[in-house]
A protein has these predicted regions:
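Flexible, small-/acidic-enriched active-site or ligand-binding loops
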Residues: 1-13, 21
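Short helix/loop capping segments that flank catalytic or ligand/cofactor-binding pockets
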Residues: 13-15, 42
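Alpha-helical interface subdomain recognition
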Residues: 24-171
């Protein structure tokens, strides 16, 4: 090993401010990951719907019970909100809008919440079978948890959203 020490050596920064550049890259990645999360949530909803239509209890499909309908409807609402916010992020990304940080954080937060919610509800609708390895519910749950931590926690993205809105004097 060698150690090099510079003392009173002239230095010149290369490139732009590193932190701003890193946040811009994370904003771009957040928009792309949001679409992956929306896609995963859609599959979880479809799996839950198909199972609810096929599974019968007390002589009728469990999809006919109001509690199951409400769960499926709640999943659908969260997914559509996440999709809309992801499109907003994609729009901001496509034109390099000044509001990219707001759009990316909005897409990230809503898509993470939608995917986590849909993957959990999918397991619940599958009942005991949702906890087994026979169905792929666990794969979507684990992927939702992994993507929730990619690029930072949900708390961090919510804080970024608040800071971005404060900078715009919206909050």
């Amino acid at each position: 090993q060698a150690k090099i020490k510079f003392s009173d050596a002239p230095a010149e920064r290369l490139g732009d401010n590193g932190w701003d550049l890193l946040e811009n890259i994370q904003d771009r990645a957040a928009v792309l990951i949001a679409f992956e999360q929306v896609g995963g949530a859609e599959v979880a909803l479809e799996m839950a719907k198909e199972y609810a239509l096929d599974r019968h209890a007390f002589g009728r499909p469990i999809a006919s019970y109001q509690a199951i309908k409400h769960r499926l409807a709640d999943m659908y609402i969260q997914i559509e909100l996440a999709r809309s916010n992801s499109y907003y992020g994609a729009w901001a990304l496509s034109i390099d809008a000044a509001e990219l940080s707001v759009a990316a954080a909005t897409a990230r937060v809503s898509a993470t919440e939608a995917y986590n919610f849909a993957s959990k509800e999918n397991i619940q609708i599958h009942g005991g079978m949702g906890f087994t390895w026979e169905f792929n519910c666990h794969l979507y749950y684990r992927r939702s948890r992994q993507l929730a931590l990619t690029l930072g926690s949900q708390r961090r993205w919510k804080d970024r959203l608040v800071r971005a809105l404060e900078r715009r004097n919206v909050a």
